[in-house]
Regions:
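Short coil/turn segments at alpha/beta junctions that flank glycine-rich nucleotide-binding fingerprints
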Residues: 36-40, 91, 112, 162-163
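Helix-turn-helix
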Residues: 25, 33-67, 71
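N-terminal intrinsically disordered/low-complexity leader segments
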Residues: 1-21, 32
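Hydrophobic alpha-helical connector segments
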Residues: 71, 82-115, 177, 200
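Short helix-capping/turn signature of helix-turn-helix
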Residues: 62, 121-129
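Amphipathic alpha-helical packing segments from all-alpha helical-bundle domains
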Residues: 78-81, 85-86, 118, 129-162, ...
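C-terminal peripheral helix-coil segments that are non-catalytic and often amphipathic
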Residues: 1-10, 104-111, 149-161, 166, ...
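Generic hydrophobic, amphipathic alpha-helix propensity
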Residues: 22-31, 47, 72-76, 80, ...
Length: 214
């Protein structure tokens, strides 16, 4: 998994399957607790109780609460990388890849609502003791390189290069596209009944028309 490379054990060895599974369990429980009670009320004890383990087990795997929070944030990137790039790669044309980017990104948000709630809590309430900027948490150089796959500018440029897309300012269009996709997060957090599939369809139609080479 992506975040397995973020932190090695203090003994400098790779984790066993059992250790990896335990970390994933603790991360999932941390997400649930943060989403349910808010970050200010989240403690290692509550997370350990949710997982049915001792607090010492949580600290063994993550060292500190900050270490656990970094792993929670890294898991967000992992989930996105497991969802969006494969969907794009399965598509054949650049138009289909654009649609796949939009649909898979919104599907990722739709199927990870507890994570979104937890991350919203962390974004407003969590201050890392390390002094890191929130946007840098959970990132490694390797992971940052992999996250470049989530930048729609790449597929937009590819579409122009093949002649499938017309001319348009790629960077500005990519920013607008990302903003439109990411806007669904606040919407679904405020309105759980929001029709994300219709929203996906609308965005696909709008941006396909915008970039299509007539």
């Amino acid at each position: 998994m992506i975040y397995n490379s973020i932190m090695r054990s203090k003994r400098g060895r790779d984790r066993t399957f059992t250790e990896t599974a335990r970390r994933q369990q603790i991360i999932a429980c941390a997400i649930d607790v943060i989403a349910e009670v808010g970050y200010p009320q989240t403690t290692i004890r509550k997370i350990a109780d949710r997982a049915g383990i001792a607090m010492s087990v949580v600290l063994y795997h993550f060292g500190t609460k900050d270490g656990l929070i970094e792993a929670v944030i890294a898991s967000k990137y992992q989930a996105a990388l497991e969802t969006v790039p494969p969907a794009i790669n399965r598509a054949r044309t650049q138009t289909d890849k654009l649609a796949a980017y939009i649909r898979s990104s919104i599907d990722y948000f739709d199927t990870h609502r507890p994570q979104l709630t937890a991350l919203a809590q962390l974004g407003t309430s969590y201050k890392p003791h390390s002094g890191k900027h929130f946007g840098d948490l959970g990132l490694t150089p390797e992971l940052s390189e992999q996250l470049a796959q989530l930048d729609p500018a790449t597929l937009l440029r590819a579409g122009q290069k093949t002649g499938e897309f017309c001319y348009f300012p790629v960077d500005s269009t990519a920013i607008a596209l990302q903003a439109a996709v990411n806007a669904v997060v606040e919407k679904i957090l405020r309105d759980p009944e929001f029709d994300v599939h219709r929203y996906s369809d609308d965005l696909v139609k709008m941006f396909s028309r915008m970039v299509r080479n007539a």
